[in-house]
Amino acid sequence: MIGDPVMLTIRRNIQRPSKALLKSFDGMPTGFVTDAYNGKGCLDFEIKPLMPAMAFHGPAITAYCGPMDNLAAMAILDFAKKGDVIVIATSGDDTAATIGDLWAFWAKKIGVAAIVCDGLVRDVAGLLKVGIPIFARGIKPNSAFKHGPGEVNMDVTCGGVAIGPGDIIVGDRDGVVAVPLAQVEQVAAQLELVKKKESEAEARVKGGEKLKFWDPPALGDRVRYID
């Protein structure tokens, strides 16, 4: 081998969605977003918020950290901008925590909207004081090394979903949904239709109407009654 092995691969310049497209996701729950995206984009259900009131949305910047390592997570703070969602992929590594409270403090100081990690975190008491939305697979006090290899702003798989820099990430107490940058405009248009239908259905239920969630005549003899 000529020279030392590469410890980090970093893409410094990425495309983010427009402010207008981001605004179309304001206040939209994850259920609406995945419905508008044809039921796709949901990260693994094991990735949960540290506390319930942690709704967010924003463009992804991504880090890949190898087992028991967080070098890429440290480096990504130099490339984060206000409103970004830091997505940290670890291939579900459970050997050590990827981030802690001091790291989260600096992320919040930058103005990061949220952190999503398919690995583990630590310093929970401190993380809750920082107050930034954090979604992770679990908690463990072990600290990680900073040896690499790692990647920043490359395509990753987090929670079973392919995510690239600039994709829109939406999270709330139900989970996390990722919408690819190339699909954002289409999903944003569908969101308005989903919101309209949900609002109409809610008004009908509150008005006393029993909604028809299934249609027995349409199923015909494919329904078997046993009494």
What are these regions (language model features)?
Residues 175-177:
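Channel- or pocket-lining gating/hinge segments that regulate access to a cavity or pore
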Residues 2-165, 179-227:
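Feature captures the catalytic cores and cofactor-binding loops of soluble hydro-lyases/lyases
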Residues 169:
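C-terminal binding/interaction regions
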Residues 172:
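Beta-strand-loop-alpha-helix segment that lines the small-molecule cofactor/substrate pocket
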